[in-house]
Regions:
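Membrane-proximal basic amphipathic "stem/tether" segments
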Residues: 144-182
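A structural motif corresponding to the C-terminal lobe/cap of the Radical SAM core domain
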Residues: 1-160
Length: 182
């Protein structure tokens, strides 16, 4: 990561997807959770802005697995290992192994592709749609914690940083509304 920084990179995105090794194995991620967390730490230490993505709504994940993923997302943000995070619901896109598995197991709630926009669960899960949406929202709410806000303020180095934080705050509010339970 130091070489990336030296070469002019400023940003790196890690698709963590889940904090559960079984899920990572089932979706053929090819990584261990510990390795991904360590990568976030090393990239941040090298001076790169780390963005992390996580997803909720895998058909085999229950409450424990959801809590693990929420906790990991919040921890990465609170400790500053990730500067930003995106949490969404998992979408089984046609043609993927996950989509095929959904068809084989009758896990799809809809085949209306206009609804495959990551704003609502598409797959049946053990915990229900409302709980998944609550999990997505709970990760975004860490942006309102005193530690996270203080770290962002201390990290301001330029007017560009101020504008970025303003845009990011707007997006957080937007995502909270996107995933608000009806």
């Amino acid at each position: 990561y130091k070489l990336m920084k030296k070469a002019g990179f400023r940003f790196v995105l890690f698709g963590l997807e889940s904090a559960n090794q079984e899920t990572l194995d089932r979706i053929n991620k090819g990584e261990k959770i510990e390795t991904m967390i360590e990568s976030c730490k090393m990239a941040q230490k090298a001076g790169l802005s780390v963005h992390v993505t996580i997803m909720f709504g895998y058909p085999w994940e229950g409450e424990k697995e959801i809590e693990n993923t929420v906790a990991l997302g919040r921890e990465l943000l609170k400790k500053g290992y990730a500067k930003t995070l995106q949490a969404t619901v998992c979408i089984p896109y046609p043609g993927t192994p996950l989509y095929k598995e959904c068809l084989e197991n009758c896990w799809l709630q809809t085949e209306d592709y206009s609804e495959y926009d990551m704003r609502r669960p598409i797959m049946k899960t053990p915990v229900g749609d409302d709980r998944l949406m609550e999990a997505v929202q709970s990760v975004y709410k860490v942006a309102f914690s005193p530690e996270f806000i203080a770290r962002r303020i201390v990290g301001i180095r330029s007017w560009e940083d101020v504008k970025f934080i303003g845009r990011a705050a707007g997006k957080v509010f937007g995502h909270l509304l996107d995933f608000k339970n009806s």
